[in-house]
């Protein structure tokens, strides 16, 4: 199983990666700090085709919404499940994510236990 985590916050990346590895020791997860880096990884590495992409909404250079639009234009990623996440739960952001083809939206939880429960549900579904 492969995934791509796109987040500009190194602390959030670390917690997310540790949680993913706790749930599935065999997961291969690459990281990108923004949408530009994510698209570069997804278009330049034909051997890396993630099953899951986790996109933070608010990032510099290219935010998660713009990145999602671009990813949806890449035919080789049609099977990929894309989860947007953010500390915001604004209806407009949730709606836009769904409209653009995100699989679901995760509101960043306050605790690692909630994150583990959420990610476990995603990966084991």
Question: Which residue stretches match the model-derived regions?
Answer:
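Receiver (REC) domain active-site loop signature in two-component systems and cognate sites
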Residues: 59-62
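A Lys-centered signature of the CheY-like receiver
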Residues: 108
């Amino acid at each position: 199983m492969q995934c791509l985590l796109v987040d500009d916050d190194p602390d959030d990346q670390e917690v997310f990666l540790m949680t993913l590895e706790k749930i599935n020791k065999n997961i291969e997860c690459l990281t990108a700090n923004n949408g530009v880096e994510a698209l570069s990884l997804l278009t330049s590495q034909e051997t890396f085709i993630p099953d899951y992409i986790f996109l933070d909404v608010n990032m510099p250079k290219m935010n998660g919404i713009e990145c999602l639009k671009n990813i949806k234009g890449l035919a080789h990623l049609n099977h990929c499940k894309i989860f947007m996440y953010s500390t915001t739960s604004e209806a407009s952001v949730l709606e836009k994510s769904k409209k653009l083809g995100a699989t679901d939206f995760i509101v960043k939880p306050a605790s690692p236990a909630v994150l583990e429960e959420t990610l476990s549900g995603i990966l084991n579904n």
